[in-house]
Amino acid sequence: MYNLAHRFLKNLNPETAHNISIQALKLGLYPKITFTNSEILEQTIWGRRFQTPIGLSAGFDKNAEVIKPILNLGFSFTELGTVTPLAQAGNPKPRIHRFPKHQALINSLGFNNKGMKIFENNITNSNFKENFQDKIVGINIGNNKETKDILSDLELLFEKLHRLGDYIVINLSSPNTPGLRDNLKSHSFEKIVSRLHQLRDHNHSKIPILFKISPDITEQEKKDIALISLANDIDGLILTNTSIDKSSVEQELKGGLSGRPLFYKSNKIIRDFYTLTSGKIKIIGVGGIFDANDILTKMKFGASLVQVYTSFTYNGPYHIKKLTLELKSLIKQQGFRSISEVIGQDS
């Protein structure tokens, strides 16, 4: 039944299909997926135990509406958002485009979300920490489009939300908010990192703060970000967001490209950052993961964890169980005793 429903959704406008999927998940209309976790896939990172390295990327559950259903589908962790202080509609529609032949999506959503207050209420009402003590929930935050001072928005969001999640992500890399990626320039990036760390200390918090990076940065920007990350002892980087390079799908649409065409580009950046930081900064690898071999490749280049999104939308609710079981088998076949042994093998 669920496979039929998924095939039906793939014939709809992508944003309509997404909205229907969210409503179905809220109503409990999804398969209850069970499988036995294996210690071979477990890791402890930032003092938190991840049952597997597989999480859901930000962008799917923007308003923290389906935390429980997503975790019930087999994800070890989910990342909510991106949330902004005030609700905003985002960019004009249509703003999501499928390219099945390329296993890709292009989106120009523009941080559409219901705002911080509804987001906060949804997390609080979910009681996920009581119901899912063995799962991890991250919160991805960003600035409103009209904001002149990005730090004021980030400070407000951090103050309100840092107690509600297991880690915080600062989104500096969406191509759909004008000027956002300028904050990856060394001076701006260092200022944001420093201020968020000060704010965390002021709140007597130890929550990990990660930064989501663009795949389109220059070699010099990589070096600058790596140096700043090491100097400030940041908790982690998410590599990478979507790309403005859409040459692989031969499209001139506005927005960011995700899916299979991003795989090799994100892999290179993962390997580069792992090398530049001597493996001292934790990396969540994102971009073009469709099977267990893809996960293993990203981890061998230096990722400790991975996130999927596009392949989940293409392959449906059983995809995560399939990835997890395949990964467990692959790890054993290659002679590893633990998933953590894989990290950085090819860097």
Feature-to-residue mapping (PLM):
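Glycine-rich phosphate-binding active-site loops on the catalytic face of alpha/beta enzymes
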Residues: 76-88, 172-174, 236-244, 295-322
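A gly/proline- and charged-residue-enriched helix-loop-helix capping module
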Residues: 81, 86-133
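Active-site-adjacent beta->alpha loops and helix N-cap segments on the catalytic face
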Residues: 86-95, 116-117, 176-205, 216-220, ...
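Short beta-strand/loop segments at the ligand-binding rim of alpha/beta enzyme cores
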Residues: 49-55, 132-141, 200-217, 273-285
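Conserved, mostly hydrophobic/aromatic
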Residues: 13, 56, 78, 119, ...
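C-terminal helical cap(s) of enzyme catalytic domains, especially alpha/beta-barrels
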Residues: 87-103, 246-259, 312-337
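Glycine/Thr-rich beta-alpha phosphate-binding loop at enzyme active sites
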Residues: 22-35, 175-188, 222-279
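Catalytic cores of alpha/beta
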Residues: 63-70, 155, 217-231, 275, ...
